[in-house]
Amino acid sequence: MASQQERASYHAGETKARAEEKTGRMMGTAQEKAREAKDTASDAAGRAMGRGHGAKEATKEKAYETKDATKEKAYEAKDAASDATGRAMDKGRGAAGATRDKAYDAKDRAADTAQSAADRARDGAGQTGSYIGQTAEAAKQKAAGAAQYAKETAIAGKDKTGAVLQQAGEQVKSVAVGAKDAVMYTLGMSGDNKNNAAAGKDTSTYKPGTGSDYQ
């Protein structure tokens, strides 16, 4: 009985010892793993810190570089703006000078044109006045000549008309006397001696060369 208890106690002790040993091993393994994990975490943290520090330094360096580049670009932009402003001012001054010169030239040309127009107007007025005077004088002379010609034509026409009428009257009278003489002669040829004697007498009232008869 006692031996069974002893054996049971022995087995229990072995089991306990094995359990403790196993527990110890497990605890050792766990501790080792914990240390390894701790070391790993520490290394990771160190690496992270290193990377963070490196990143911080890199960021800081990058910031400095960016700042310097920005400052440099700002200076370049300022210089470019200053140059552009100077060129614009020079160009503006040049344009203003050219515009002023053109304005002066246009003013001078306008003055010359106005003076030339005034001179031409005066010359034209003088020529027009002279032409009008000459034209008026010529018209006056032509009118006087036409009036004189009309007067002379009227006088000549009057004289010619009078001569024609006088000549026609003389011709009519001559014809009438001739007809009368012919009738008288005819009657004398067919009448008695008395009439013949009377016919032998000059009973004509026409006198040659006078162109008229008389009583």
Swiss-Prot record:
It is found in: Nucleus. One of its GO terms (cellular component) is nucleus. Expressed in the shoot apex and leaves. Expressed in dry seeds. Expressed in roots and leaves. The keyword Phosphoprotein does not apply. Residues 13-24, 32-41, 54-81, 88-111 have a biased composition (Basic and acidic residues). Keywords: Nucleus. Its main location: nucleus. Induction: Induced by chilling and mannitol. Induced by drought stress. Induced by salt stress. Induced by abscisic acid (ABA). Induced by D-allose and D-glucose. Residues 1-129, 190-215 are annotated as: Disordered. Residues 192-215 have a biased composition (Polar residues). Belongs to the LEA type 4 family. This is Late embryogenesis abundant protein 14. The gene is LEA14.
